[in-house]
């Protein structure tokens, strides 16, 4: 089973920790996992030029923008499951993750039927970050596996919450059971 985890955080902190903890268990369960840190990529904003829509549902990740998405598209289309992680900014996913998701327009027909999971770090409440991720999956025709949210503000806070760790391990098991 191939899993691509996307970290939409601007810093190395709680979201990345959650994705790494999830990836650890997924690997123990025999999955092949790649973590992509969006903060270390060059992913430009979508220009809404619609070049990617040429070819209809047969489109193959053709985007006129030449950046790191060209290397990421094949990883997403080859994955059985995609895990999206984000801290919540004003209750929503980060702009970094939203920008990335906008750029997947070039391949969205190839995401249909894939599994999708989400993790989010929030300072208070649950916010809409996970609902944003789930809505993205619904639009792409993906199968929702589940999510884990954790409360934290400062880097390292989330690792202290043992219930988050337990829920991450359960989510990892659920992902590999489906695959």
Predicted regions and their residues:
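Short, surface-exposed, charge-dense and proline/glycine-enriched linear segments
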Residues: 63-73, 115-120, 142-151, 176-179
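A short, mixed-charge helix-start or loop-turn motif at secondary-structure junctions
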Residues: 4-5, 115-116, 154
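Conserved residues at the C-terminal ends of beta-strands
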Residues: 39, 85, 122, 150-151
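Alpha-helical membrane-embedding segments
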Residues: 136-138, 154, 174-175
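N-terminal beta1-alpha1-beta2 submodule of the flavodoxin-like/Rossmannoid cofactor-binding fold
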Residues: 1-86, 91-99, 106, 158-179
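A short acidic, helix-capping loop that chelates divalent metal ions and anchors anionic groups
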Residues: 152-158
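Short, glycine-/small-residue-rich phosphate/pyrophosphate-handling segment
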Residues: 94-95, 106-150
């Amino acid at each position: 089973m191939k899993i691509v985890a996307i970290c939409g955080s601007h810093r190395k902190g709680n979201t990345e920790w959650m994705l790494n903890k999830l990836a650890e268990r997924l690997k123990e369960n025999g999955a092949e996992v790649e973590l992509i840190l969006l903060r270390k990529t060059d992913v430009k904003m979508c220009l809404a030029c619609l070049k990617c829509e040429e070819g209809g549902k047969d489109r193959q990740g053709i985007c006129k923008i030449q950046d790191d998405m060209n290397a990421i598209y094949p990883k997403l289309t080859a994955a059985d499951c995609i895990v999206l992680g984000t801290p919540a900014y004003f209750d929503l996913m980060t702009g970094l993750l939203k920008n990335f998701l906008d750029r997947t327009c070039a391949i969205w027909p190839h995401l249909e039927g894939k599994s999708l999971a989400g993790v989010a770090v929030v300072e208070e409440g649950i916010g809409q970050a996970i609902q944003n991720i789930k809505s993205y999956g619904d639009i792409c025709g993906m199968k929702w596996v589940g999510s884990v949210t954790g409360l934290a503000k400062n880097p390292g806070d989330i690792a202290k919450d043992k219930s988050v760790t337990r829920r991450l391990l359960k989510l990892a098991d659920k992902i590999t059971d489906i695959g």
